């Protein structure tokens, strides 16, 4: 069973699937080592790693290159965050086969205008496209995939945009009808109330996807108990962990006047070399260097 088939099967299983964000192959490798079922190829994290806003400033090829490198590094299925699809349905038709060829098992596409503004930015510009327009994008994505197990996940930002639960449910139903394999419902409220209400009201056949960044008090056991959620995505925790660790270590080095204290709490150089695939290279040297 290939990665696409494994991802589709896991998405439909009663047991909750867990995906961790990544912005490079090293982060993906660490997430896989920690036991996450899938890797979320985060556009937010990639943008943050370049120190630019998550607003379609980076090119699609930069994100695609990241996806290709991650998929080549880990065995876990990779989910690509393709924002709004990089344009209209025609752009989607051209981009989906490229992501599939890069080794990605699913794409997540949101129903906002292009260029987008990041969902969790306070007072951000959150404009939704027409339902019919987004249905066309979903149909284009489904029509462009070559493997029937490759998943197209539709993300509605109706709650983010303040359009309310009724609009979010209506959009989700239309997106399911257009062929979406799952619905990602997003919220930036600090409590899970509107998400729980949406999940309770959802009567569709396809599973839901949650990203609990804004409401971290909702635990995996709580999500599992809802019964309609197939996947939870931790959408930005790799870059936040990395930024926090770097900030703390850099500050300590300046404060302590060197690395004599902080070095003991860092991963060793030997550990980093191992993460770089040193054992594989040594085996290749043994076999082929004569």
Regions found by a protein language model. Give the residues of each.
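Extended, intrinsically disordered, low-complexity segments
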Residues: 143, 238-290
């Amino acid at each position: 069973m290939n990665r696409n088939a494994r991802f589709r099967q896991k998405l439909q299983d009663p047991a909750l699937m867990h995906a961790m964000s990544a912005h490079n192959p090293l982060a993906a490798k660490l997430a896989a080592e920690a036991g996450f079922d899938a890797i979320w190829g985060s556009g937010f994290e990639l943008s943050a790693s370049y120190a630019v806003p998550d607003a379609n400033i980076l090119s699609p090829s930069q994100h695609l290159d990241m996806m290709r490198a991650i998929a080549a590094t880990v065995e876990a299925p990779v989910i690509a965050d393709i924002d709004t699809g990089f344009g209209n349905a025609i752009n989607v038709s051209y981009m989906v086969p490229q992501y599939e060829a890069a080794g990605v098992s699913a794409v997540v596409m949101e129903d906002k205008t292009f260029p987008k503004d990041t969902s969790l930015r306070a007072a951000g510009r959150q404009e939704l496209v027409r339902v019919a327009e987004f249905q066309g994008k979903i149909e284009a994505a489904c029509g462009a995939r070559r493997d029937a197990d490759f998943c197209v996940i539709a993300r509605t930002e109706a709650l983010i945009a303040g359009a309310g639960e009724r609009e979010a449910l209506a959009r989700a139903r239309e997106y399911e009808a257009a062929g979406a394999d799952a619905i990602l419902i997003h919220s930036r409220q600090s409590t899970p109330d509107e998400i729980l209400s949406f999940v309770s009201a959802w009567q569709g056949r396809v599973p839901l996807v949650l990203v609990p960044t804004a409401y971290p008090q909702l635990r995996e056991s709580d999500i599992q108990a809802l019964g309609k959620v197939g996947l939870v995505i931790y959408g930005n925790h790799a870059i936040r962990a990395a930024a926090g660790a770097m900030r703390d270590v850099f500050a300590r080095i300046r404060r302590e006047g060197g690395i004599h204290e902080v070095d003991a709490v860092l991963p060793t150089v030997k550990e980093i070399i191992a993460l770089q695939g040193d054992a594989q290279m040594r085996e290749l040297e043994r076999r082929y260097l004569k």
